[in-house]
């Protein structure tokens, strides 16, 4: 069997939680996560939105950490691959690995919040935004 598997996973793209991540964990495979920020579109989606107060309960200070802590809280995840050329963004990303992580109940709240943001974009075409046109960080 393979030594590792590489997949997309984030609060927005969380379909792997049901079968793929548990299967990889059961098989003892390393799991490398790609696109925790949807190629940067995540930042367009959360731009101008305030981080919820309850994010402090799991030591989350930024929207980047919000997504990364969600991913890192899954016990099947071995490594999260982020892409940036900005040293400040890299430091912010690294800080997500420290402190508390969200529990399953909190991860449910995180999914719901992000789903609301996605629904706003996809269900209100008058906003002029789509996932494809969202600005990237």
Which residues are covered by each model-predicted region?
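Catalytic beta/alpha-barrel core
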Residues: 5-13
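Structured C-terminal cap/extension of enzyme domains
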Residues: 1-4, 18-137
């Amino acid at each position: 069997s393979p030594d590792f598997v590489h997949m997309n996973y984030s609060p927005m793209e969380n379909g792997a939680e049901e079968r793929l991540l548990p299967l990889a964990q059961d098989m003892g495979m390393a799991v490398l996560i790609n696109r925790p920020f949807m190629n940067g579109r995540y930042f367009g989606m959360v731009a101008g939105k305030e981080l919820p107060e309850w994010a402090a309960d799991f030591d989350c200070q930024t929207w980047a950490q919000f997504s990364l802590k969600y991913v890192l809280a899954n016990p099947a995840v071995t490594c999260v691959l982020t892409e940036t050329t900005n040293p400040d963004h890299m430091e912010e990303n690294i800080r997500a690995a420290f402190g508390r992580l969200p529990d399953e109940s909190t991860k449910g709240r995180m999914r719901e919040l992000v789903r609301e943001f996605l629904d706003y974009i996809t269900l209100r075409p008058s906003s002029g935004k789509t996932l494809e046109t969202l600005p990237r960080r």
